[in-house]
């Protein structure tokens, strides 16, 4: 009986907090408190103070700090789309690490901005330093793109 009330309370709490949550899922959202992680499936959305990410599946690891969950690593799978300021990053797989504030995308990667579209195999986006490294289809060919915050073109 206690388990029943615990499940009802948990579902009520999750439904009330869902709108304010940085993490949303269309099909399932599994919380693993022991391993401090979430697994989300179906129309996944993740938001933080830097970007918004969408994918078919996501695994997010977190730490608890002052009674809040701080997401440290977010891994996105299939149909990945990341909106950052005026840029949109797309790929098949992405991993974000909070410690260095870097997003790494792989597989049919693109960077789209109001003035350009770049494509390649791998993208490393350094959010703090406003730097993008795009690896083309050839593993040995690298293209580095520096974006100026005040650039008009």
Regions found by a protein language model. Name each.
Residues 1-153:
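Mature-chain termini and adjacent capping regions
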